[in-house]
Structure formats: structure tokens, C-alpha cells
Amino acid sequence: MKSLGIVIPSFNELESLRVLVPTCINLLTENPNLQIVIVDNGSNDGTNLYLEMYSDIERFKYLILEANQGYGGGILAGLNQLETEYLSWTHADLQTDIFDIFKFDLNSLPDYFLAKGIRRGRSVSDYIFTFGMTFYILLKFRRFCNDINGQPTIISRKLFYQFNYPPSDFSFDLYAFIMAKKMNSLIIRKKIHFSDRRYSHSKWNFGFTSKINLIIRTLKFSNSLKRYLND
């Protein structure tokens, strides 16, 4: 397998990181072609102090952002730190297992590809929300993009080089998916179990109102992305 980099953005996820980081260290020991970057995206729970304990681990990086740069901004900052041929991102909240990345067959892939999990085990309301967004994107872009925010996501470096001013919010996943479709990339999907949070709480999903706000932001961004693709 070619070299793989994993970006894990976090915002006030210290308790989850206490579980996740030792697992990351073990993965690095077992996989010499692996690099991991954890992005502390403006946390105020002591995440930076915890990550500093691992400053001497080879191929393990941490990036401290003093102010929160948004979901997409944190991921992009981490991706720019990677030196690997394949790049990926997943969340620090433990709702998916970092080992899920290795469920994808990353051998003999073309220059342009996107691999992404399809979340299973979610609530009915979340499934309805995802279906609605999938249907809207299909109508808007004439491209089928199911479960846009599924985890994890893995892309080729050549696809990443096509990213031009991606959004800094939760539209980042939509942008990556649409760019992959635009470049006629191979799309690989795999069902991934999605668990409840062990610690903390979602930083955006507080119920119906937060979903409506996310929909509005996504609709606005999709309009600007549509104009960009038509230029």
C-alpha cells in the first residue's frame, strides 16, 4: 500500500483523545508508511497540553490552532501537514473506529479516487436528514452523493491538488465529494458502524434547529459551488 496520512480534527475532545492517541501510536508502530496528524482546532479543555506529551513520536504530528477554524478549516490545516500519497480524515469523537480506514482496499487505485464510509446505526431522523440532502444534491449537481458526511474519507493526493479554496465549515465534505465527481474519480463506498458518543457532545447537532441551520448553510454553499463548476 502507498503511504497514507490520517488527519483527526478535534475540538474539546480531550477524553476521546485519551483513548484514541494510544491507538494511533500502536498503528504507527505497525504501519511504517502511515502518518497521523491530530488538529487541536481551538480547544480550551487542555488538549494542547495532552498532545505535547507525544511530541517525540515519529510520524505523529499535532497542530495547535489557537482559534477554531471551522470543521473544514481544521481538516485542511491537517491535510497540508501530510507528506503521504493518500490522505484521509476522520473524527476524534470515537463514533467511528480509526481501524475503519483500513477496511478499504487501497491497492492498485487510479490517480483520482475518493473512498468514504456510509454510516450505519444512526437514528431515523438522521437517516431522513441524510436522504433529503442526498436528493437535493442529486437535483442540484446531477451527481449522486449519498451520505456526504460519512466517515472516514480517503482521497488521492492528485485529487487534493484540485481543491481550490474549499469551505471552512461542514460543507467541506460536500466540496470534496463534488470535486471527486468532477474529476471522474473512482468512488469507493463501504458500510461503517456509527456509534453513540462516549464523551462530550456534538458541537453542531443539538436537534432540529441545528439541522435546519446546517441545511441553510449547505444550500448557500451549494449555490456558490454550482457557479464555480460552471465557470
What are these regions (language model features)?
Residues E13-L17, S43, Y71, D97:
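Donor nucleotide-sugar binding loop of glycosyltransferases
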Residues M1, E15, Y165-D231:
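Hydrophobic helical membrane-anchoring modules
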Residues L34, N48-Q81:
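Conserved donor nucleotide-binding strand/loop of the catalytic core
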Residues E13-L27:
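Short, well-formed alpha-helical segments that are part of the catalytic scaffolds
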Residues S3-G5, Q35, Y175:
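Cell-envelope/extracellular polymer assembly enzymes that use nucleotide-activated donors
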Residues D40-L49, L94:
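A conserved acidic beta->alpha catalytic loop
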Residues A67-Q69, G73-Q81, Y86, I98-F170, ...:
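Acceptor/aglycone-binding surface of glycosyltransferases and processive sugar-polymer synthases
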